[in-house]
Curated annotation (Swiss-Prot):
The lineage of its organism: Eukaryota, Metazoa, Ecdysozoa, Nematoda, Chromadorea. It catalyses: [protein]-peptidylproline (omega=180) = [protein]-peptidylproline (omega=0). Residues 7-170 form the PPIase cyclophilin-type domain. PANTHER family: PEPTIDYL-PROLYL CIS-TRANS ISOMERASE, PEPTIDYL-PROLYL CIS-TRANS ISOMERASE 2. Pfam families: Pro_isomerase. This is Peptidyl-prolyl cis-trans isomerase 2. The gene is cyn-2. GO terms for molecular function: cyclosporin A binding; peptidyl-prolyl cis-trans isomerase activity.
Amino acid sequence: MPRVKVFFDITIGGKKGGRIVMELYNDIVPKTAENFRALCTGEKGKGKSGKKLHFKGSKFHRIIPEFMIQGGDFTEGNGTGGESIHGEKFDDENFKEKHTGPGVLSMANCGANTNGSQFFLCTVKTTWLDGKHVVFGKVIEGMDVVKAIESKGSEDGAPSAPCVIADCGEMK
């Protein structure tokens, strides 16, 4: 089964930041990968929240240098919201893949089996997250854009400039 590739076109402080291309592990975590892919395309329409199930226009709301950049809350925009294509939350699929270094794509959660739409991209190796967060892909192009977003972060995670997913979708 070929791995799916998706993209984010990023703006940083209202200016073009570049493109991040990610490969999804649809062969290892199909449910998690499909959730992310469909949230990139927006093809599922509106969710239970009444908001479109789509990352387009959402922000990286939590950016911690030398750790990760977190986004995917398209309902509230502050880390308290988001929802999956499978309903509000869904279970951890498996923990086969690990947080091995920069570019790892993983699900953000608030405990076991609470996956929604929030995700993070690691900027360093984060082994303490293994077995707690489902890794479902990796950056294959645009780590420079990830680093540019990371540079707008702070110790408490508050961004110094808006880092927005201006457009997103599936690579064909």
